[in-house]
Amino acid sequence: MSKHKNQRTARTLEKTWDTLNHLIVISSCLYRLNLKSIAQIALSVLAMIISTSLIIAAIIFIISANHKVTLTTVTVQTIKNHTEKNISTYLTQVPPERVNSSKQPTTTSPIHTNSATISPNTKSETHHTTAQTKGRITTSTQTNKPSTKSRSKNPPKKPKDDYHFEVFNFVPCSICGNNQLCKSICKTIPSNKPKKKPTIKPTNKPTTKTTNKRDPKTPAKMPKKEIITNPAKKPTLKTTERDTSISQSTVLDTITPKYTIQQQSLHSTTSENTPSSTQIPTASEPSTLNPN
C-alpha cells in the first residue's frame, strides 16, 4: 500500500511540474505580444498553483513520515513480545534444579532424622551440623553474587541520634543467650556515641622578667636638654647727647618765636609811652635853641 501511495504522489508532482512549464511558456509569449494584463493574470495563477503544489507535497511528506514511525514502533513491540515469549518458554522447559545448581554450586542434602530414635546428644550434634551447612550455603551465595551497587567515595553521613535503630548485616550477641555457635557468629554492636575529649587545663607558666641590659661597648646616650627660650624683650631706646641737643634746639626754636613776638609787642608799647629822642634832650648834648 505504501508503494502505491508513493507512486501516486510522484505522478501528481510530475503533472504539476508539466503544467507549470506550460504556464511559463504561455506567459513569456504574452509578454512578447505586449499583452501585459493577461500576462499578469497568468503569473498570478502560476504563483497560486506553485503555492498549492508545495503545500500538497509537504502534507504528503508528513503523512509518509508518520506512517514510517508507526511501522518502527510496531516492529519494536513485536520484537519485545517475541523475546518475552522465548524467555518464558525457556524457563518452563528448563527444570528448577538446574537453575539452582547454577546459582548454588556447593549444595548439600539436608539430613532427615527421627526424633524418637535419637538421644539428646545426637540431636545437638545434628543441629550443629545443619547450622554449619546453612552457614556454608549462605557464605557461598554471598560470595557468588556480584555487587551491583556503585561504591561512592564519600559514604553518607549517619545521624547522631540513631544509636538503636541501625540495620546491621550481622547477628547481635544479645540475641544468642547460651548458644555457643551463635556467639561464635555474632558480633557486638559498636557504640557510635561520641567519646568525650579529655579537658586539658591550662598550666600557669611562671612569668619571666625581662631587663633591658646595655652592652658595655655602646656608650650611654644622654637625654637631649630642651632649650628654654625667654620671651623677646623690647629693646630700650638709648638717647645720646647729640640727640638730646638736637631735641632741645628744636624745642627752643619752637619757643623763641613766641618770645620774640612778645618782646616786640612790649617794645612797641614802651616806645609809644616814652618821648622820642629828638624831643627830650639829653644831658650830654647841649641844647641848641635858635633865639627868636
From Swiss-Prot:
Residues 67-292 are extracellular. Residues 92-161, 189-292 are annotated as: Disordered. Keywords: Disulfide bond, Glycoprotein, Host cell membrane, Host membrane, Host-virus interaction, Membrane, Secreted, Transmembrane, Transmembrane helix, Viral attachment to host cell, Viral immunoevasion, Virion, Virus entry into host cell. It comes from the Viruses. Residues 187-198 are annotated as: Binding to host heparan sulfate. Residues 212-227 have a biased composition (Basic and acidic residues). Residues 1-37 are cytoplasmic. This is Major surface glycoprotein G. Belongs to the pneumoviruses glycoprotein G family. GO terms for biological process: symbiont entry into host cell; virion attachment to host cell. Pfam families: Glycoprotein_G (PF00802). Disulfide bonds join C173-C186, C176-C182. GO terms for cellular component: extracellular region; host cell plasma membrane; membrane; virion membrane. The record marks A65, N66 as: Cleavage. InterPro entries: G_prot. Residues 148-157 have a biased composition (Basic residues). Residues 200-210 have a biased composition (Low complexity). Glycans are attached at residues 70, 72, 81, 86, 92, 100, 113, 138-139, 141, 199, 203, 236, 254, 271, 276, 284. It comes from Human respiratory syncytial virus B (strain 18537). Residues 99-142, 245-292 have a biased composition (Polar residues). The chain crosses the membrane at residues 38-66.
